[in-house]
Amino acid sequence: MITGYMKEMSNTLNSTFAGDEIAQSWSDLFIFERTFQEFKPDLIIELGTYLGALTHFFSLHGKVWTIDNMDRKFKKYDNVLYTIDEVFNPLMEGYIKCLIEHHRQVFFFCDNGNKIKEFNLYAQYLKKGDIIFVHDWENEIKMEDIQETINNEDLKPYLHELSEKYNSLLRGWIK
C-alpha cells in the first residue's frame, strides 16, 4: 500500500516541505533521507536554491552551501551559506573545487539551469566516497548526456532501484 501511495505521490506538483513549496516530490525526500541515513556528509552543495524548501530539508542533515543565479526571498537557516552567482563562473568553479577538496565527504546536488553541464563539470572534482545527485532525470538529463563522465570518473549508481521503484526524478552516483 505504501509503495502504491509513493508512486502516486512521486511526481505530484506543488509538494510542500514544512509548509513551503518544494520542487521535489515526497519520494525524492524519502530517497534523500535514505542517503543521509547511510552517509553523513560534512558538506552539502546544492546548485539551484529555487524557493529554499529543499535547502531547509538539507539543512536538517548538515552544513549546506546553496548557489542560485536568481535572488529570491526564502527563509534563512544558520547552517546554510546562500550565494547568488552563476555556477559556471570560473571563480565559483574554483571555489567549489576547493571546498570539495577540503571536506571529508560531500553530497553534491545538481538542480540549477543546466544539469547536464553541472554534472559533467563538477563530477570531476569529487573524491572517493562523495555522492552526486541530479533532479529531473529523463526530462532534463539522460544517461547519454553524462555516460562519458560516469565512466571517466568511475561513478557507481546509488539507489537507482529505489528511484525507479518510486518513480523519482532523482538519480545518484557515488565515487
Regions found by a protein language model. Name each.
Residues 1-108, 112-175:
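A short alpha-helical cap/connector motif
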